[in-house]
Amino acid sequence: MKVIQELVAHFDRRGRLSRAQIRRLLEQGFLAADAPANMVDLAQPVGATYYFRVTGESNGPCWGTDVYTGDTSIAVAAVHMGLVKAGMSAIVRVEAVSPPTEFQGSARHGVTSHDFGRYGSAYRLAAV
């Protein structure tokens, strides 16, 4: 699965895959894996892109807004971003990004994220 995700991310970054093509791969079960709890082990190198099936949660560790610390729960961040509701499932795109010097917390979609200083890894989520 990881090799397929890396190939798709490679072509996606270069604009060689349309959203419809990615969605078709997802629907056929070729692309998305179940989401890990967080991105601690996957947030390197910067630019690494994954597609995960996630079931939203409203409680759990969440630091940042739009860009989250590597140890933030993917399920909670997805609800905070408004990509999925708690208890519902969706496929999300997760990209490892350079960590900012500071993570700003906020309240969104029934989830409160928290401020945090420097952290070694970070990611952002997007709808597919």
Predicted regions and their residues:
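Mitochondrial intermembrane space
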Residues: 23-128
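Membrane-proximal basic amphipathic "stem/tether" segments
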Residues: 1-23
